């Protein structure tokens, strides 16, 4: 497990302070770069989950540069409100992360041949049948305002897919060239069901072991940009953890 947003800094001077390795949209490069380190680990078949860090040393209102825990970045775990189930959800990737309360619920489900799997899980499909995989994305915006007094809106959701090819011979490899954004969705592509929004997409003829993951943003950026001095509240993103597809 590794962090996504590194601490949720209240001042973007700190968010972008990492020299040659700035954060992108509030997240470290390992998470934010499509085909980067996180995707390289997933491509090796590793169950490597991301979480958000929300530690706080000195709050920005007291001269520091931090938010309070959970004020800006949050980790959500799909679990019952029981200690052991929360820890089980963390261990097994039933997690999504968000900044600025862009969303308060995210469910990603892959289904095919009568089987289904969610974040952190694996769906197995047979080559003997048609290997289309149906993806359903459900997200819920906040009912009220976030800690900045805003009502953020999701402007785009991306579906990202990569191949699982097994351990790399190059132990320094930090890329997965098979990973790509395969579909982008805007407000015209989702429909409302109660308090949630639903997106459906079909991956045709998935012929090899793969994984899929989802991200979304409040911006119109095609990819997260390196953080500068802008307000972190104007550059919000969420990420799911992956669903794996095994082809047999």
Predicted regions and their residues:
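C-terminal functional module detector
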Residues: 3-14, 22-29, 34-248
């Amino acid at each position: 497990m590794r962090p996504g947003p590194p601490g949720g800094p209240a001042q973007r001077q700190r968010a972008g302070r990492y020299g040659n390795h700035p954060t992108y949209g509030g997240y470290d490069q390992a998470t934010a770069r499509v085909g980067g380190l996180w995707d390289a680990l997933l491509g090796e078949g590793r169950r490597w989950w991301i979480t958000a860090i929300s530690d706080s040393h000195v709050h920005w209102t007291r001269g520091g540069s931090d938010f309070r825990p959970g004020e800006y970045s949050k980790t959500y775990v799909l679990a019952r409100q029981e200690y052991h189930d929360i820890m089980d959800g963390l261990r097994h990737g039933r997690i999504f992360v968000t900044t600025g309360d862009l969303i308060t619920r995210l469910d990603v489900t892959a289904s095919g041949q009568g089987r289904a799997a969610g974040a952190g899980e694996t769906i197995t499909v047979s080559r003997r049948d048609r290997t289309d995989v149906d993806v359903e994305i459900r997200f819920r915006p906040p009912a009220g305002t976030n800690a900045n007094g805003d009502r953020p809106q999701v402007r785009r959701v991306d579906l990202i897919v990569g191949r699982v090819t097994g351990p790399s011979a190059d132990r320094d490899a930090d890329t997965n060239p098979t990973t790509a954004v395969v579909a982008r969705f805007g407000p015209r592509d989702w429909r409302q069901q109660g308090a949630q929004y639903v997106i459906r997409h079909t991956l045709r003829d998935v012929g090899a072991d793969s994984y899929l993951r989802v991200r979304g943003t409040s911006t119109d950026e095609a990819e997260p940009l390196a953080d500068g001095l802008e307000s972190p509240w104007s550059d919000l993103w969420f990420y799911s953890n992956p669903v794996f597809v095994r082809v047999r």
